[in-house]
């Protein structure tokens, strides 16, 4: 996939940003340093910045060169995972028990790169919302942003996101019609049991047996 010359011009800046974020991973709703970095870069390119959505979420707003009412959202996640990083690269995690093992450092950097390019060229008609989401790793950060009025404040006709895939060659995009890599719903099930003596299991209701049947 060809890379526009202007983006290639600031490739090294993107590498430095990704490595900086990778070296300073933060868990869900704790992405204070990361959100500071994101906001500072967006503001330096003249992008309108809104902060503290779902605690550490950031939204940048950029209007294009025309008067179109159309608007889209471009979204990336910022949080890391609670695990230690092993290895020797200079940009390995400096925060014990925290690591960007799922590539959100790359996602954040890619969205910053898109924001910089669009801010410099404004070669589009409409409005782009750059949505930097906290707490994707099980924290429900996207849901919290919506509950706090994300789309009431920043109306989007469509929202686009992407996820890295190390098993594909560099420069390759994989896509299909409809949703891709969408999250599943979560449910909580309570099994009410009845205790009994170990020698009289037939007098009780064993939650383990019920749980196994439910699972299988």
Language model feature labels by segment:
Residues 59, 81-83, 87-99, 106, ...:
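Histidine/acidic-residue-rich, glycine-tolerant segments that coordinate divalent metal ions
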Residues 1-100, 109, 116-124:
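Acidic/His- and Gly-rich active-site-bordering loop/insert found
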């Amino acid at each position: 996939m060809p890379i526009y010359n202007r983006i290639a011009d600031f490739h090294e800046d993107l590498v430095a940003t990704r490595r900086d974020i990778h070296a300073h991973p933060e868990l869900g709703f704790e992405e204070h340093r990361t959100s500071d970095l994101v906001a500072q870069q967006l503001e330096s390119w003249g992008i309108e910045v809104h902060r503290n959505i779902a605690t550490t979420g950031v939204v940048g707003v950029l209007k294009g060169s025309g008067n179109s009412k159309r608007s889209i959202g471009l979204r990336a996640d910022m949080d890391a995972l609670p695990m230690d990083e092993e290895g020797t690269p200079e940009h390995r995690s400096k925060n014990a028990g925290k690591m960007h093992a799922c590539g959100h450092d790359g996602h954040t950097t890619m969205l910053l790169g898109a924001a910089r390019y669009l801010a410099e060229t404004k070669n589009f008609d409409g409005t782009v919302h750059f949505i930097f989401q906290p707490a994707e790793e099980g924290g429900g950060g996207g849901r919290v942003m919506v509950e706090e009025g994300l789309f009431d404040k920043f109306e989007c006709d469509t929202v686009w996101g992407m996820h890295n895939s190390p098993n594909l060659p560099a420069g390759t995009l994989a896509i299909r019609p409809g949703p891709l890599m969408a999250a599943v719903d979560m449910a909580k099930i309570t099994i009410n049991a009845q205790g009994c003596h170990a020698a009289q299991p037939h007098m009780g209701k064993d939650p383990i047996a019920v749980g196994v049947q439910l699972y299988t």
